[in-house]
Amino acid sequence: MKLAFLYAGQGTQHVGMGRDLYETYPAFREVLDSAPVDFDLKQLCFDGPEERLNDTRYTQPCMVAFAAGVTALLKDAGIVPDYAAGLSLGEYSALHCAGVLDAPTTISLVAFRGQAMADAVKDRPCGMAAVLNLDRDTLKQVCEEASHAGVVECTNFNCPGQIVISGDAAAVDRAGELAKAAGAKRVLPLKVSGPFHTSLMAPAGDALREKFQSVPFCEMEIPVLFNCLGDLKGERDTIPDLLEQQVQSSVYLEDTIRRLAELGVDTVVEIGPGRTLSGFVRKTAKQIKCYPVETAEDLEAAIAALKGA
């Protein structure tokens, strides 16, 4: 068996996430209780309100704390991956898994990232939408045609048949209309609060570059595949540049999954609320087995299956 941990990004968070893990496992509880944030993280995860949980300033530390807690539980059970990767925000969780950042530093860093991303488009109506069943080249052309209404770009190449577009709200709406006219099956607005991975995030990239100067990045203990490459990168010194680039450029998750398959990965543990990434894996490399871990029951089932493999 060759194993990868794949970490969820924003959009799958929901009120109640992590409650049973918190009640069941002291190691998970410790991560959430010690999160270095200026709000009650566990209360927001468990009880909401949903509107606040969906605000990127709060979504990011909540998601990463959840992921760090699950990672600790898996490693405590002797489950250590051969590779790690994540979707967007999940890349920070992958770096934590790989030993590059400890849990408090990772949570604090993504809280800063969330604020920087919110500040980058403050008072600017923006959005993201998933476009189904339209190829990359056609959708890129659609975005170019819609750009008279504002910034709109292809930002997440998730799997065959699903690409996310982001940008100014009017331009995203126009691109959605053009995409449907070009043959897209559906256009689905996403539950996020900003035009992530577009050029509109350049100010956030600048803020992160400055922030990274005081962040202690360690060597990777586990190889990480990076979003903006869809591939491995081994040098510690390149990590800040890749993370700065990531916030304002496209995420190549489909390419990442294909690369994992090329590397011989046959099993993936999806860490985060929901089962979205497992769906992307099945559509991209159906030979890979997926074990989504969101609940205590999921965790127990995954550990039993992986230890028996």
How would you describe each model-predicted region?
Residues 22-23, 145-147, 180-182, 283-286, ...:
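Short, solvent-exposed amphipathic alpha-helical segments in soluble enzyme
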Residues 1-139, 190, 267-297:
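FabD-like malonyl-/acyl-CoA
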Residues 11-12, 36-39, 98-249:
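Alpha/beta catalytic cores of group-transfer enzymes, especially the acyltransferase/condensing modules
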Residues 75, 180, 261-264:
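Non-catalytic positions within long, well-ordered alpha-helices that form the structural scaffold/packing
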Residues 248-265:
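A short, acidic, amphipathic alpha-helical segment used as a generic capping/interface helix at domain edges
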Residues 229, 289-309:
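Short, flexible loop segments at boundaries between secondary-structure elements
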